[in-house]
Amino acid sequence: MTAPTAEALVTLQDLEAAADGLRGIAVRTPLLPVDALTERFPAGVWVKPEMLQRTGAFKFRGAYTFLRGMSAADRARGVIAPSSGNHGQAVAYAARMYGVA
């Protein structure tokens, strides 16, 4: 395995831009405490129910962000997601939001 290059590392600025682009688009899913597990472990245990997200999975966030970052010309060429699972559903849903086939 090779070490990532500086260009490949995700920055705080990248994360903030992605969050800004998803505001009003992605469902803001809650953080829920799991009291039964918190009682057993020395730290609080929380879950984020991403099944409440569009397409039922967190993968929508990445798919939408990726399409948002594409140029209109590239989006017009279409997208392919070699998956029939959560990733494929998320890409298809995000593509439909952009009018992409």
Model-derived regions: residue spans:
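PLP-dependent amino-acid enzyme catalytic core
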Residues: M1-A101
